[in-house]
């Protein structure tokens, strides 16, 4: 079995780690950073950029730069959360109703594909570090992700060429990293406020057992919302002073978003900062500049409602766990937003104690995922992890009522069976709608899918007995099977969700990802050979200027022609021309050896001349010198 990695696929940033002996190590990416921005961009030349390179060009390519797509994963376009996303790129309803994204040239991508590109990038970083292929991974998700979102994340792993060993909840992963070396039993709360989601989990830890007692959260609350609050404030202030609304200017919006995020981060350590964006727009009177001072107090007033929203899930989680805030031994802060002083203050106020800040909030989830990978592979022993399902799973019954079969905060994996029957005489089929959520009416909860039990022998209503079994696996993903108790016939049923990727779509995306990886490799080779060509042309032209008169006119003409041919072929932006450029590079390299010989010959002559000159100079400098016999000098004293 190969090495397995742990990946935190975040809304804003992602991170990869691996177990080395008894410790987990965060792996640096190609740029040498320990976290990678969860951003994918497509340039006008068709190049795909991931991470920091994608982030750097976002201002000039906002419509083709996809960030925060974790907020779209596993969601229907009609979901209320899809309104007012505040992103410059196009989000649309795919054929299955899911929210997908589209580039300006019409290429369509599912959020799972965008996630797969990021996972692929992290996989490559791990392979470069380990020097071997990586196939297995544990990937984290917000604890409050529903079945569709978990399945879509697992699909992303498959598209990236990974065998997903386990989908693990982010707070649980953080608890693993925090408590692996702690022997004494105590109860902790993991407060995880990240870039796009908020989770809170209550766990009991002791003697290698990590038991989640309750979890709650909000999958649409995080740093992105804090950024948007600052963006809206800056837009309002600019409109007040200049009378210009920048909302429809993608380039200005991208600059303001980046400045808002930067200001938010700075105000975690400073009391005041200045947002200064020269030439943010232009009108008939000339260019306009944005220059606004932002204090920590103002920022806190802008985001206070968002911080207060995190307390509601905290109350629910404690209530479900049957505990009070005073019974919590430690509160562990996870996620970049927990660096904000106001967030720390609010957590302290609610739980009545200073939160634990001894873990790196950006890396602890990936470290926990790596530990879970180690547990699965047998590298980490004597650790038992007992997680829970965050949402109730059930069906729609008469009158549209939601009837839960598996309650929220049930330890997983778990299984529950219930007997159903027919509502009419001689009914030969029953349609069962599977929902997930906490609302009383089925329509208010997430429809995971529906299936029909067919071929039921005709009988009076209420007589047939169909036992339907729901089970949730260790990934938190639901499965359904059905059995006709009269005939003993059993049928495994795959929930056909109204959304989600089909097996054919996943396979197509896997192929596309592999093809894209090959294309990326070709593009890399193309860029390298073009750089080699530019360097060779420059050095050859320089050598021709200095030593062109030292070689024969025929050789000089051949080299000049080869330089011009290489210049011409290097103008191409077609990556398929890499071999042609390479041939011209090889040809010029061989021809320019004549120049090298001339340079070497002249160098030898110069060295010979210098040697002769040095000898003559030394002979000219020989002079007779007076000397004193020191012994005689002593005697004469």
From Swiss-Prot:
Family classification: Belongs to the heat shock protein 70 family.
GO molecular function, one term: ATP binding
Induction and repression of expression: By stress conditions e.g. heat shock.
Comp. bias intervals (Low complexity): 602-616
InterPro entries assigned: ATPase_NBD, Chaperone_DnaK, Heat_shock_70_CS, HSP70_C_sf, HSP70_peptide-bd_sf, Hsp_70_fam
Free-text function comment from the UniProt entry: Acts as a chaperone.
Keyword annotations of the record: ATP-binding, Chaperone, Nucleotide-binding, Phosphoprotein, Stress response
Residue list for modification Phosphothreonine: 197
SUPFAM superfamilies reported in the protein's UniProt record: Actin-like ATPase domain, Heat shock protein 70kD (HSP70), C-terminal subdomain, Heat shock protein 70kD (HSP70), peptide-binding domain
Protein name: Chaperone protein DnaK
NCBIfam families: PRK00290.1 (NF001413), PRK05183.1 (NF003520), prok_dnaK (TIGR02350)
Comp. bias regions, Basic and acidic residues: 618-637
Region named Disordered: 596-637
Source species taxonomy: Bacteria, Pseudomonadati, Pseudomonadota, Alphaproteobacteria, Rickettsiales
